């Protein structure tokens, strides 16, 4: 799953994410913040962005072999705080965002909704809880 900026000469991958409903993607707030800032500057809507799914290979995304769905809305966590570089604080706080899509992906063998693990009481996870993540970003800080 990736979010892409449309430019005829440039296939710019903005960020990766996970399909949490047929029409919703869970991703990082720092990715969504960039999209929101650029849309405010240029056209005040998300028509230049779309979400693609269906292959783990970035080259396949670039060659348009996967479905492409426009973005309808972006919801950044209300307590998101980006890293503060000049204070050497490289960790973002509440770096989470949900992207709502214009319509749903068709669920196939290659496109699936992730199964989010919740504890019984829907409480916050304990510090140092073992988790699995996916994406094409940094693998260490």
Question: What are these model-predicted stretches?
Answer:
Residues 9, 58, 105-108:
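Short helix-loop capping/hinge motifs at secondary-structure junctions, enriched
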Residues 6-22, 91:
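A conserved glycine-rich beta-strand in the N-terminal activation segment of trypsin-fold
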Residues 19-20, 26, 100:
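Hydrophobic, repeat-rich solenoid/adaptor surfaces of innate immune receptors and signaling proteins
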Residues 35-39, 79-88, 104-141:
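Active-site substrate-binding loop(s) of clan PA
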């Amino acid at each position: 799953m990736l979010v892409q900026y449309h430019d005829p000469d440039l296939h710019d991958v903005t960020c990766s994410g996970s399909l949490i409903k047929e029409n919703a993607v869970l991703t990082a707030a720092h990715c969504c913040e960039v999209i929101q800032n650029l849309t405010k500057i240029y056209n005040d809507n998300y028509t230049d962005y779309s979400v693609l799914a269906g292959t783990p290979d970035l080259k396949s995304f670039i060659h348009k072999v996967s479905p492409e769905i426009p973005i309808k809305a972006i919801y950044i966590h209300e307590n998101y705080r980006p890293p503060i570089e000049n204070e050497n604080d490289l960790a973002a706080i509440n770096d989470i965002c949900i992207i709502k899509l214009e319509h749903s992906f068709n669920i196939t063998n290659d496109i699936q909704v992730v199964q989010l693990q919740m504890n019984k009481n829907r409480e916050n996870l304990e510090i140092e809880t073992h988790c699995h993540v996916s994406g094409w970003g940094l693998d260490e800080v």
